[in-house]
Amino acid sequence: MKGRHMTFYIDFIADYGAITGNDDLAFSEVNCKLAEEFLKQSMDFPMIKNLSVRPFNTVETGFAVAQLAYNSTLGRQHIIYHNTAPRKDKLTARLNNAGEFLAVTELPNGVRIIGVFGGYTFGFITSPVYRVKCADAGSQFRSRDVFPPCVASLAKHANEPLSTWELLGEQITDIPTVPKNTICSIDGYGNLKTTIEISDNIRAISIKNITFPIMQGQGIFSVPDGQLILAPGSSGWNGNYFTEVCLRGGSAAKLFEHPVPGDTVRLLSA
């Protein structure tokens, strides 16, 4: 594709809308700024899809990033841009709205990920992750006011190796991985996508001190209606699928009084 314009598809993942979701004004503001920066760098408008995650929830963000990136076949035309910044790296007062730094990686399939390095936002990524030479302060709304030029620059560099990108900083060696037995995502049906490893001796599970017996199966529909089951689900990559806690015909999330990604699932053998 070298020598002609590339059309970029950007998945933009952010924690703006606990109430407003993808309709939050912040998404539109960032989308507009991205379009402006692409034009400034002589590129066509990107196609942008917004995805809202829970406020400050880096587990949910990291899961969404990996699920979309690893399963893509768009290569370097696909950029994942994410912004979930709890600003928990330093609990003292911050100057000039400083927060966690921007980071970048490229997967073997060519998809590039650029976003705030905070908590578990890169916790499912196995490729090398690098700092981006970009300011980490200057605005309360860094995803609109500070980061978009870096995203556009990364796209501009799509035909070249990431190692030659002028904004590439040092490699990050300490990347937190998401713990076992953790809820990673909750879909619209109330199925809980988790990092639980299937084991024959799991007889019940407990979430936030709410306990129910559970069966195991090869799929979420391999039990009668109304039964709670732990089974491989529809999410995952490279042949590895996340186990899901599902209530057939109902909502496991409602049954366990609406846990959130990051909550721990306790496994019981009896």
Regions found by a protein language model. Name each.
Residues K2-R4, S72-G75, L95-N96, A103-L107, ...:
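Solvent-exposed alpha-helices and their adjacent loops that cap or buttress functional pockets
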Residues G3-N83, D263-L268:
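Alpha/propeptide regions of enzymes that mature by internal proteolysis
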Residues V30, S42-I48, R54-F63, L74-R76, ...:
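Active-site histidine-anchored catalytic micro-motif
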Residues A69-Y70, L91-R94, F101-V104, T182-I183, ...:
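A generic local secondary-structure boundary/capping motif
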Residues E106-N109, K208, A270:
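Short acidic-glycine loop/turn motifs at beta-strand connectors
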Residues I125-R203:
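Anionic-ligand-binding alpha/beta catalytic cores of soluble enzymes and soluble regulatory domains
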Residues K193-V260:
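A conserved acidic, glycine/proline-rich C-terminal tail/linker
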